[in-house]
């Protein structure tokens, strides 16, 4: 009986661990971590190549802040829904979180292309625009995720331990502050960056859309 009890305890512990940290969460966290590690390891651009304009560098760095904040929101929501006992509700969240994860992967790919381009000279308009457009898509996707959370929060409260709910709200507030700060930094560089983004083809209302989406006070947090 003691052996069976110990075995059951180990299985229960493994189940809880798997619920709190899902494989999908690990993949997203690892992808984000690898990107920032690659960024830290990037050497300075060779002196013989054209320098990337400083407004563009500041603009893209603010985009990295948005990526980091969104990845924190993703991890917090994944952990929160993983401990819910409402399987139907969890399935709904898993679908929208899966879309959010893909949008972050696309943003990371766009940032990787930008980082590689800066090593060879000033990136062309298409590379810079891809970062902006991918960022727009990610922010819009996560806005839908947060809106869904806002609608389903009362139901989640009955299926998730209150400790997880408190932690989730704290992380969301911190992430939203980071998002708004990054959006303000991007907006400050918008006029200077616009000629580089619009060199080939204007990206329709990209700057205004991003600022409106991230800075919208109606975002449910």
Short names for language-model regions:
Residues 1-95, 99-102, 122-221:
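Long, low-complexity intrinsically disordered regions
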Residues 97, 103-120:
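Signature of small four-pass
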